[in-house]
Amino acid sequence: MAIKMRLQRFGVHKRPFYRVVASESKNARDGKFLEILGTYDTILDIVELDHNKVQKWLSNGAQPTKTVKKVFKKSKFVAKTNTKVEK
C-alpha cells in the first residue's frame, strides 16, 4: 500500500489544529496512522516537525500531499536527497 504524509484535523469548531502523520492512503483522514511527524497550528501559524522522522519516511517512499508540502515550506524543511555525481 502507498504511504502518504497528510494532515489529521484536531481542535474545536473554527479553531483547527493539525497533526502531520504518516498513514496508509486508504485510511480515513482522521483514522488510523503509522506515526506522528509533527503539528501545525493554522491560527498561530506554528509548525513543529521532527525532521528525522520526516526524512525517514521520505526515504522509505512516503508521498507528502500538496498541503503537507506547503507546511514543509513554511517550516523551511529541506529534504536530503542522495545525489550521485558522475565523472
Swiss-Prot record:
Keywords: Ribonucleoprotein, Ribosomal protein. Pfam families: Ribosomal_S16. GO terms for molecular function: structural constituent of ribosome. InterPro entries: Ribosomal_bS16, Ribosomal_bS16_dom_sf. HAMAP family: Ribosomal_bS16. Belongs to the bacterial ribosomal protein bS16 family. This is Small ribosomal subunit protein bS16. The gene is rpsP.
